[in-house]
């Protein structure tokens, strides 16, 4: 009986490592293959940024196409900061709300985000126009593609009574907030695949299938 349990355990371990290997292969090669184009100039400039694990898009707050403050009200944000650009990211709700710093990361939060479909949230921050750096890239976009990007981003917010649903008191600072989001987070639908899909919607060069930041930023 003990031998059977050991054999079963070994099969489970073997299956896990096979799955992990396939997952890494898919994410690696999916991130290497490019789709979309980069423009030398355009109607608007946006930014794509990463903290090494998570990615966001940074969009001009007010243009002829949209005034983001009519969708994401400035009310819950401190009026001491700048509202020139709006930074938006999608991700695991538990991870977002319970991990303001990496030092506070819990194993249970990480495992839930990785292996179980979980609730999601939008992270929003207003700021001045970002500066280009190794972890932040400027991208030009034309008006029609920007409209598609806007539709994608707006559709990611979960609405309540036809308005986005603020998660009160959970921002990391006075200049950022969290909102309820649509869709579930899991291994094949990560914060980076959201950014990747946003860029693909706007026909911006990125990886075909990017689960990690490198599969996005390496193309920009």
Question: How would you name each of these model-derived features?
Answer:
Residues 1-12, 34-39, 63-80:
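N-terminal short leaders/motifs
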Residues 46-140:
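Glycine-rich catalytic cores of cysteine/serine-nucleophile enzymes that process amide/ester linkages
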Residues 2-28, 36, 155-220:
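Activation targets extended, charge/polar-rich intrinsically disordered C-terminal tails
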Residues 28-51:
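Alpha-helical transmembrane signal-anchor/signal-peptide segments
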Residues 132-142, 179-186:
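Second-shell loop/turn segments in exported
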Residues 136-156, 161:
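Internal catalytic-core helix/loop-beta-alpha segment
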